[in-house]
């Protein structure tokens, strides 16, 4: 639980980073796009189909935007919740959800990037609501971990998502994978054990809550694959975000009022003396939405496999950038552990791909 507290802005020329952290970006998994009729809009953005831009340049720009938004939201979250002194991770997560709801509505209803889909039944509504609850748990835990562990360690923990996905898939659906797939998970786990034992800024609570965030992302992925299976209930990723975001904001509201009850008063008082906080929160919330938008665009212009490969690279890049900017201490063993985990994730992806090909024959 994160207690409400008064504002404390840290002004240090060379701060120590023994309690730094970061969180996974606010993001939803991309399900398969159901069949639908194409939609057009006079405001449809140029980045979806621009005859004047080379496809190669367009794809490169989208990938660059994807990297920028994913790493940017991590660094902004870290700066706000630790260095700037904004100690309200639940409220921050709620602003992310409100931003995603507003931007999703504009992008779908006005810009027409994808056709609007509607919730067709009470059962479908309850399914999306359950996903929103898991979504909240994952993101709030990730944001809370900002205050305790560094970005690099957070990304190492986040890379273990395939392990938790395999565990939940077995526990919930009794689905088993090939021996090769399970063996590939060994370096995923052993790498994070190695990194944890040699992490200079290790914090037990930060570690546990970051693990909870990673497990929550995996659980959401598995549950989403189970409850949104029928063609009539499948939603495009952008439509799913459109409905999940406001539900998540409503779920978070009572928690932020109870746990962080003085956040609005503190925010108003702070804004009077330092208006920068308003721009930081607005920018942070916007970048949080851009993570989801660029996720969709990368998949549209490349493939889901490309997105998976980029995700593996993003963890390493984000960790490196955070060390350069915030200069949190790292060790050779910690770097080696992170590398082993990333290698395990790559091996896991390849093993699953081969397993699927064998099952299709």
Swiss-Prot record:
The keyword Transport applies. Signal peptide: none annotated. Keywords: Acetylation, Membrane, Sugar transport, Transmembrane, Transmembrane helix, Transport. The keyword Repressor does not apply. Belongs to the TPT transporter family. TPT (TC 2.A.7.9) subfamily. It is a multi-pass membrane protein. It is found in: Membrane. The modification N-acetylvaline is found at residue 2. The chain crosses the membrane at residues 56-76, 90-110, 125-145, 153-173, 192-212, 240-260, 276-296, 306-326, 329-349. This is Probable sugar phosphate/phosphate translocator At1g12500. Residues 89-196 form the EamA domain. It holds the Pfam family TPT. It comes from the Eukaryota. InterPro entries: Sugar_P_trans_dom, TPT_transporter. It comes from Arabidopsis thaliana (Mouse-ear cress). GO terms for cellular component: membrane. Its main location: membrane.
